[in-house]
């Protein structure tokens, strides 16, 4: 015990009584130092854990009471007092030995160095001693383990989430021997593991209040070791930990520490990880300081578990649609970069939400999808909503009945969906088209009823009705081109018949004739041909008798009008040929004078000058030559009429010339048709 000297007013070191424990502690520098370090680390854990856990703090303090008294009695005197007191020769050894035992080792730069320097044998010795002293209290063993590791593994304090390191850091750096010690002790104290987890978490939170405070690697290692085997310690008490998180909402460092600790339960099991994320991190999504870690944790969780089947059934509509709003709604509490990151994760979240049997679950998502698909929603969100609605309609048959019920109250959203279906009809599976066609037919009837009632939103009703008609037309498919098919068959039949007749020289020897005879159609055909020939002859005789009289009467009625019209047309063309050229020249001169009188900007003058040159060029190069050619053609026609009619151009003469022209045209067409048929038969015979 250190006492005040009466003579000099300084400090002197007084030896304790001769107890075996004290003498052995003085001799064994390594073991005594470790034990005092453990006692010192345990001595500072004076925090209130009355809620939510109950610990055996009284027994824990009683067990280490002797160690604490020994440390207090062996206090090192202040350095200023040492120089005032002459010290005995034996005392310096004792004074220098005590600081070497109690002085806290400085932090290592790297955790790897601290783990290499850790004496695992000394740790095992301390744990054996703790188990022998506190035989019936395994929670004290676990606390000793965490305190010892945290005391020995001191490095500069890191940010709470360890985002720059792998997900299993720092436990991944622990050696196999140390892992065996930790796992063995956790197995022995299996009944106290949950209390031990709470102890580590609350101790970490209390260390964050201290300045500068210790690094928390020892507690982190213990938390990771516990949750690797027992993640349900966290997931069975999510409400308690969420309340703890909300109570520290004003302290981001503590919140991130809690989120990191609870998140360790999900890296070995996707189901437990999703429970943690949905129960702890989704409620705080949107808080500026906590959102980056929440989304980064979800990204890492889904990346570590590419097989999403183990997470089916974890995300329901209650959790899915807030995520949809966070991902796609603009101006929410997430930054654009976090929104983009969440959008990239959204397809996998959809797979988790829809589950193993989407054909029986998607109809529960349809109403919320439809209510959000408004014309004013953002383009990216609209695209995602329409794709999801189409998936619901094509995968789950019950979605169509849900749509029919919601249709009258969601006309604007339904119009967008119908237009999207019309655009993507070719990509819809054929099995789903039939049910969609029935649904669209029902919606069309609803549209007609709404239009008759004249209710509000008639614009949306008209849009929906137009889209329904287009979809029904697409569903029925294009009409077959019957006219083209008939024409093709007719051409093929005529070609085959011509080829058959030409190759066999007669109908009797041809294949067509033999087929007609064998089928009994030839006699019937001959009778039909005879009747047609008789009727045709009668018709010709009737026309021969009546047509001249009708033609003469028609000519007598129409001839005066036609002659008058011909006279006027001839006069008009004569007038135009005499006066049009002079008017065109006059118009050109007046246009040039107009441009000279009007004062315009230089750019406009250049533009008008270019247009003038273009018009003059067009007039001289196109209009005038065309006009002269037309006049020459009319003159030639007039001269030809005078020559053909021998000077007197009458209607009878013109009629005769027109009939000759028609006859010549008909002969030309016959020649062309015969040549084409010859060519077609040649091509068919070559095949």
From Swiss-Prot:
Q: What is its main location?
A: endoplasmic reticulum
Write down any Gene Ontology CC term: cytosol
Q: Which residues cross the membrane?
A: 481-501, 614-634
* UniProt entry tagged with the keyword Nucleotide-binding: no
UniProt family annotation: Belongs to the TMEM214 family.
* Known function: Critical mediator, in cooperation with CASP4, of endoplasmic reticulum-stress induced apoptosis. Required or the activation of CASP4 following endoplasmic reticulum stress.
The record's section on PANTHER family has: TRANSMEMBRANE PROTEIN 214
- Provide the assembly information: Constitutively interacts with CASP4; required for the localization of procaspase 4 to the ER.
The name this protein carries in UniProt is Transmembrane protein 214
What's the name of its gene? Tmem214
